[in-house]
Amino acid sequence: MAAAATRPYDVLLVEDDIADAMLIQDALSERGTRNLTQVSDGIEALEYLRDPDNARPDLIVLDLNMPRMNGREFLAVVKEDAELRTIPVVVLTTSAAPDDVTGAYHHHANAYVTKPVNLEEFEAAVRSIDVFYLDIAVKPPREQGH
């Protein structure tokens, strides 16, 4: 793996498959992840993101095919939320269907990587996000009362 990001960062991993979650956790820890929180569906992810006691993640890694609220539905909600839509999202899924790829980018995704996970491709996606979102961009403060 290449050099870690210039600063540690927080990741929300939205993945229901334990083996995939462990693989991504290992890859991200090598990239400088400070805190990684894993949830198993979009509902849990939104609950985490909307809880004012939780740190706002610097990056969301999202599977599309999950129970309850899937990744497509989650992306649609995130895109409409002024606070959440600024968080970069890497979609990591088994689907290479053109509608899924186009839909993901239309609904906020910053990168799209297919499973089985090619760690080099995944790392390149995260690294491209590092350059702008983690090293250059300033995160907006969490609004009071949210």
Language-model regions, residue ranges each:
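His-Asp phosphorelay/catalytic-motif detector in bacterial-type signaling
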Residues: 7-8, 55-59, 83-88
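Conserved acidic segment of CheY-like receiver
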Residues: 8-28, 45, 60
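Acidic, metal-coordinating helix/loop segments flanking the phosphotransfer/catalytic sites
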Residues: 23-25, 38-59
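Active-site residues of response regulator receiver
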Residues: 62-63, 93
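Receiver (REC) domain active-site loop signature in two-component systems and cognate sites
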Residues: 66-69
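Short, glycine/charged-rich "phosphate-handling" switch motifs in NTP-dependent
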Residues: 110
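C-terminal output helix
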Residues: 117-130, 136-142
